[in-house]
Amino acid sequence: MQQRQLGRQGLTVSALGLGCMGLSYGYGPATEKQQAIALIRAAVERGVTFFDTAEIYGPFINEDVVGEALAPVRDKVVIATKFGFDCDKPGQMLNSRPEHIRAVIEGSLKRLKTDYIDLYYQHRVDPDVPVEEVAGTIADLIAEGKVKHFGLSEASAETIRRAHAVCPVTALQSEYSLWWRQPEQEILPLLAELNIGFVPFSPLGKGFLTGAIDSSTTF
């Protein structure tokens, strides 16, 4: 498996990563837990070292599955997870207040069976919390050893610049595929300028190659 360096803070990951959301959330019924664990471990055996989850997937269930699956190889893999929602409240509204980040990271660490998170993304930008406060909180968590690297997801160019000025951003995660190429206009050039890595989600168009669309499909 080829390796890639994300950003310039020393994070190296496999060229192919496994997004684990669909095992618990978003695309039909959840995969049976032991089958999901077996799939994740099969990916490890094939050289995948980069695994993506989030507290909102389930909510919480996906982190549990990923944590159990990767516990035997924790020191050999990179785990990315995300914060930014009130997952245990109706409506699951955005919440990136510093005190909330500090509270929810403890739950993620417990579910993932680890004492640190390799890459901690703000899942979505919270318009009610200045991103400088978010970045400052993550910088503190990095200093405490609970987080290794800071990431953003679906953030604008301005937001990326502001966050990066407070705490170096290692990676941005955004949708990118043959069917959605918006990041090419402004985001990818900015990431190259700032030496920030890019992690695409839904690179196969959210199931485009699974038979959902065929020659009989009309638009």
Language model: regions and residue ranges:
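Active-site mouth loops of central-metabolism enzymes
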Residues: 22-34, 87-102, 123-128
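Conserved, mostly hydrophobic/aromatic
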Residues: 6, 18, 36, 51, ...
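N-terminal binding-site loop/beta-alpha segment at the start of enzyme catalytic domains
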Residues: 1-78
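Generic structural signal for well-ordered alpha-helices
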Residues: 3, 40, 63, 67, ...
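Active-site gating/metal-coordination segments in enzymes
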Residues: 88-121, 175, 179
